[in-house]
Structure formats: structure tokens, C-alpha cells
Amino acid sequence: MDKKTQGAWLLHHARKLQATTNQDFDSIAFAGKSGTLLSAISAERQSVVTQQRLEALARANHISPKTELPAIVAELARQKLILPGSGGVEVLGLTGHSVLEHTSRIFDESSHEAHEEAVIFVSEIASETPTTDKAIAEVVSDNLKLSRKEVGDTLDLATNIGFFDSEPISAQEKLLFNGNLFRRDDARKVNAILSTLKAPEAALLTEVNQKLQETGCLPLET
């Protein structure tokens, strides 16, 4: 997964966490809020953002000026993205489209837990193709060294928060998907079709998806 994609998921998940009291994804929440504030600052036309304006931007993005803003400002300063002063902060050559990469780096450099990486990893997979929790649990467990129980608990918690969606397809299995991209009926149909693909066909589909992700479109051969 490239850093811009990871940054986008961090912003998305941080917004979902605002509606909960869950404390299991602190690094995601912090990186996402840092990126959100960074995005707001980058949209300002001034090279210096006053403290009053900075606090207003924080409140507008559900960031507490007293309990959360100081730590976020300190992190952005550590990343050399802003320079704090007595009356506000100076923006150091920040551009809007670099925000996602900066957000990703803040998360990567944090002391985050493996289950936080897992929900980002699963979110990306589920947005590409609906997949079962059984299939994804094996991949996540192997890649991130989590036990099957830890993966299962993480997937349940993530779906309850709304990082991605799930739909039971049997007594022992759930379908994971992105509800913004796939309706529930469509997700089940896609999964049913994909489960019938032979290995060479599945490999070709993976190759096409990778090319689409890299280029955004593919030429139509006539």
C-alpha cells in the first residue's frame, strides 16, 4: 500500500473514531487528527496562522484546543512542517497533496500496535474486493504476527466502529466489504463470482486491479 493510500485511511478511520469512546486505536486517531489539522492549515492562504485561528481550525475539526492541540502542534513541529511561535505557527512549505504522506509518516513513526496496522490493511483489501473474514484472517495473521483470536477480535471491533462493513454469509463466516463502494447484495454476488475463479483467473484479476491502481485506467483493445 502506498503512503497516500495509507494516509487516506488514517483520516477516514480517525473520523469514525470521533463517534466512539474506543481507546484501542490511539495511534490512528492521533495521526488522523494531525493530518486533518495539517490539511486545514495547508488550506489557509497565510504563511503564518495565528493562535486564535489555529484553535478555531482545531475546534472546527473536532480537536480539543486544550487537551489535543498542543500534542499535535508538537508533532507537526517535530516533523518540520510548522514552526511554533508565541502568536501562532509558521507554515513551512506545506502543500495540500502532501498531507496524506505526512499523515502516513506520523503513524509509521508512532508506537502503534499491530492491530492498528491490521485494520488499515483490511480496509484497503475490502475496498478492492469483498472478501471473507476467514480468508483475511489468515493473511493478517501471517503478515502481522497476530493470533487468529486477536485478528477475529480486531475485525469485530473494526466493523462495530465502521472502518469497514460485514455481512454474515454462513454460521461461521462473514463477508467484509466497503459499504461506500459495494451494496450488501452486490458484495455477496461479487464474492460468489470470485470464489468460482480458478487460480490463473484469480491471478489475472489481481494483475488488472494492480494496473488500475497504478494508472487509474486501462486502454480498451479493439
Explain the meaning of each model-derived region:
Residues 1-222:
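Non-catalytic recognition/regulatory regions in large multidomain proteins
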